[in-house]
Amino acid sequence: MTYLDRILEHKQIEVAALKKEQPRQRYEELQAELEAPRNFSASLKRPANKGVRLIAEIKKASPSRGLIVQDFDPLAMAQRYQELGAAAFSVLTDQQFFQGSNDYLRQVKGAFKLPVLRKDFIVDALQIFEARLLGADAILLIVAALESSQLRDYLQLSAELGLSALVEVHDGAELDEALQQGATILGVNNRNLKDFSVDINTSIKLRPSIPSDMIAVAESGLKRAADIDAVNAAGFDAVLIGEGLHISTELRSLIWT
């Protein structure tokens, strides 16, 4: 069983518990009481003559690396990343595999003005309603984790709720699927979710196949200034970086604004 298989199997258990805790109808009723989401999509648009925008990830651990940040403080981390010039935050909410928390997202959203992406593995529409209630401005939809009909329906639902959707792909077939189902923000994950191996050439090879009017995001494995130069030259609008910002003084020294 792959990493992704194990994660998705556990997500189904989480969703079953979520449905018992609060039915979809109640989530739908609560939407009217919320403030409008911040514009995640607009925050990623690359200004003329500027470099890629930074989505800074608030991440404590991962299945492949274990604990990444010993003294984890999501607000302190977000503050550092905002000072670096981040355009948006990505907050891990998966608890079982990444030691994330819904509370981390709430805290970051409440303390800062930047748009916030809920980074999790969505397998059910109820998780999208939940993301909206948590204060997320955007969600992650992983093509490898969803059927075609799910991807299409979840893109439509997120739009109805005012949420941006970062649609993640890893190869050409997944990219074609994302485009066919109506994605407008494309994330190319350099990490293979089956075995968690990383190759940053994945994003560079796929970039020419992403329409120029879409927002293109390079994700995972970016740890050196040379990596940023490469995806910058390839024409990406933004990068999503978590562990790299924590461990690399090179990345932290770059000018992101």
Curated annotation (Swiss-Prot):
What EC class is this? lyase
SUPFAM superfamilies of this UniProt entry? Ribulose-phoshate binding barrel
A molecular function (GO) term: indole-3-glycerol-phosphate synthase activity
Pfam families (alphabetical): IGPS
Keywords annotated in UniProt = Amino-acid biosynthesis, Aromatic amino acid biosynthesis, Decarboxylase, Lyase, Tryptophan biosynthesis
| One GO term (biological process) | L-tryptophan biosynthetic process
Annotated coiled-coil segments of the chain? none
Keyword Metal-binding assigned to the entry: answer is: no
This chain belongs to the protein called: Indole-3-glycerol phosphate synthase
Family according to the record: Belongs to the TrpC family.
**Protein EC:** 4.1.1.48
Which pathway, metabolic or otherwise, does it act in?
Answer: Amino-acid biosynthesis; L-tryptophan biosynthesis; L-tryptophan from chorismate: step 4/5
Reaction(s) catalysed (UniProt annotation): 1-(2-carboxyphenylamino)-1-deoxy-D-ribulose 5-phosphate + H(+) = (1S,2R)-1-C-(indol-3-yl)glycerol 3-phosphate + CO2 + H2O
Say yes or no: keyword Disulfide bond present.
no
